[in-house]
């Protein structure tokens, strides 16, 4: 069956049969995706057995709550980031730290404080080094931003996330912290480690078929928002991890890598309220936020009219220094 016949068949089955109100966008997407799927079936000569096995696979992946993991592992999330980067470039928006994937393990509703937060529940205290994250939220002109919300989440020493790992307390290693009047925040937490896909899971099943591993480097996730600005989704990854530039989710990007140095100065140890030497990351990340979606058309018009010079007024940079113990 050629594409013309495929399109006619889809029109007959999914457009002409409508008897009630139609959501035009949903119809457009379904018709296009079905057309491409049917064409792939023709091009690859997929058998009915292969098609039904595929449907069974997606059923299993959904029941295992791994569809989000699969999206990351096959590069869908990274593609969406690159597409967003391209859109920003076309609009003349540049600077700041790169965005990168959210991943499938965010949970809304983490405890929220102002200025300082402790992220861990103490269950791994003394078993894993402590991490102190000091951050500052600014605009691109260096103005401090009060009231920015910084959401942070990461894995424990076993590479597991609370809620998905039922052995952890709710919201362990998940917190939201609001910046103070001077744009500052501090998070006291534990050193994250990387993780691998469940070895018997549906995502690893596909990766095995592709000859790929399913490992991620150690990393910390962020959402950064401020009133009137678009949310930024990003993360930093840890230098020295064997999977740093071989992340199965393709999340590592230039500008998002933290390098640790040892700190043995007793005064600094005391200032941090610690009892022994630790490591620190001399790292500054500029997280760029853009005006909310509802204002994007206005921003683009302004950019075109003013040669992008005024667009910088609508940008927000987020700077953070990360200290490890």
Please state what every model-predicted region is:
Residues 325:
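Nucleic acid-binding interface residues in structured DNA/RNA-binding domains
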């Amino acid at each position: 069956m050629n594409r013309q016949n495929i399109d006619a068949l889809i029109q007959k089955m999914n457009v002409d049969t409508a008897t009630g109100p139609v959501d035009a966008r949903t119809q457009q997407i379904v018709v296009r995706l079905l057309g491409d799927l049917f064409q792939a079936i023709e091009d690859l000569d997929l058998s009915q057995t292969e098609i039904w096995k595929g449907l069974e696979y997606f059923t299993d992946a959904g029941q295992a709550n791994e569809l989000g993991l699969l999206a990351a592992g096959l590069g869908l999330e990274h593609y969406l980031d690159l597409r967003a980067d391209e859109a920003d470039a076309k609009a003349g928006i540049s600077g700041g730290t790169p965005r990168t994937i959210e991943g499938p393990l965010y949970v809304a509703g983490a405890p929220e404080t102002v200025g300082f937060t402790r992220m861990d529940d103490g269950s791994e205290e003394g078993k894993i080094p402590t991490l102190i994250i000091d951050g500052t939220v600014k605009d691109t002109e260096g103005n401090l931003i009060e009231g920015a919300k910084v959401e942070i989440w990461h894995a424990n020493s076993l590479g597991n996330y609370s809620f998905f790992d039922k052995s952890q307390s709710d919201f362990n290693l998940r917190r939201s912290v609001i910046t103070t009047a001077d744009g500052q925040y501090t998070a006291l937490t534990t050193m994250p480690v990387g993780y691998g896909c469940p070895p018997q899971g549906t995502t690893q099943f596909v990766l095995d078929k592709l000859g790929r591993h399913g490992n991620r480097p150690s990393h910390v996730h962020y959402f950064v928002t401020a009133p009137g600005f678009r949310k930024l989704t990003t993360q930093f990854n840890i230098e020295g991890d064997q999977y740093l530039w071989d992340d199965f989710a393709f999340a590592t990007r230039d500008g998002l890598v933290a390098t640790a140095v040892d700190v043995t100065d007793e005064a600094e140890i005391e200032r941090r309220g610690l009892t022994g030497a630790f490591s620190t990351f001399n790292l500054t990340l500029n997280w760029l936020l853009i005006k909310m979606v509802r204002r994007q058309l206005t921003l683009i018009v302004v950019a075109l009219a003013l040669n992008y010079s005024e667009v910088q007024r609508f940008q927000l940079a987020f700077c953070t220094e990360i200290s490890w113990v």
